[in-house]
A protein has these predicted regions:
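Acidic, serine/threonine-rich low-complexity disordered tracts
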Residues: 20-111, 117-120, 125-217
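Hydrophobic h-region of N-terminal signal peptides that target proteins for export
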Residues: 10-18
Length: 217
């Protein structure tokens, strides 16, 4: 059930006006998504973003628990920290427990490349590579990425499906629907709906063909 693993939040950062004499105060954003499989809530995805001057720090936490007849059949836990400066990734760290399989990813930036240690294996990436952690809508404009869980390289293809009206928690949203998929490994696929620049729903299909939705509270 690898495809249940979710790091689903896409958010747009507000513009922070700079003061004439003093640095702009940090802007902080907190969002929570409820993850639902069928009629059952199976987890949450939370994100905290702090934008201060030219630096953005991001903390993502995802918890998923699937139970069958009151017995836990699957658990997924993921934490991720990112630091961006002037639009460039400078540090990344994630820890994942995918139903007992654990991963540790650390990325640092050098002047002309990114240096990654993924589960004890070292590799170098171009500076254009970025984690497909889905907290920024910029993901639909980039195709060179890596899996935030495993560090696996990904090439993202985006399909523009068009406009749709969705009702979430009783509130109608005029949304734009995109599909994104990894063309290298083929395992990663998501449907994303935005109201303006803000993600309101994500859908994936589980390995058992169940529909899994992540809706903004």
């Amino acid at each position: 059930m690898r495809t249940i693993a979710l790091s689903l939040t896409l958010l747009t950062l507000p513009v922070v006006p700079a003061g004439a004499d003093n640095p702009a105060a940090a802007t902080k954003i907190h969002k929570v998504f409820d993850i639902v499989r069928g009629n059952d809530k199976i987890g949450t995805d939370t994100i905290d973003i702090e934008h201060e001057n030219d630096t953005i720090t991001v903390k993502v936490k995802t918890d998923v628990s699937v139970k069958v007849m009151y017995i836990e059949a699957y658990r997924y836990e993921h934490t991720c920290n990112e630091t961006w400066k002037n639009g460039q990734l400078v540090a990344f760290k994630s820890r994942t427990n995918d139903n007992g399989t654990k991963h540790a990813i650390d990325v640092t930036a050098a002047p002309d490349k990114l240096s990654m240690d993924a589960d004890g294996k070292h590799s170098e990436l171009p500076k254009t590579a970025a984690p497909v952690s889905l907290w920024s809508k910029d993901v639909i404009h980039k195709n060179d990425g890596f899996d935030p869980d495993t560090g696996k390289r990904m090439a993202i293809k985006v399909t523009d499906v068009g406009e749709e009206v969705l009702t979430i928690h009783g509130t109608p949203h005029q949304t734009h629907h995109y599909k994104i998929a990894d063309t290298l490994g083929g395992e990663f696929a998501r449907d994303l709906w935005y109201d303006g620049d803000v993600l309101v729903r994500t859908k994936i299909i589980g390995s058992d063909n169940s529909v899994i939705l992540s809706d903004l509270r």
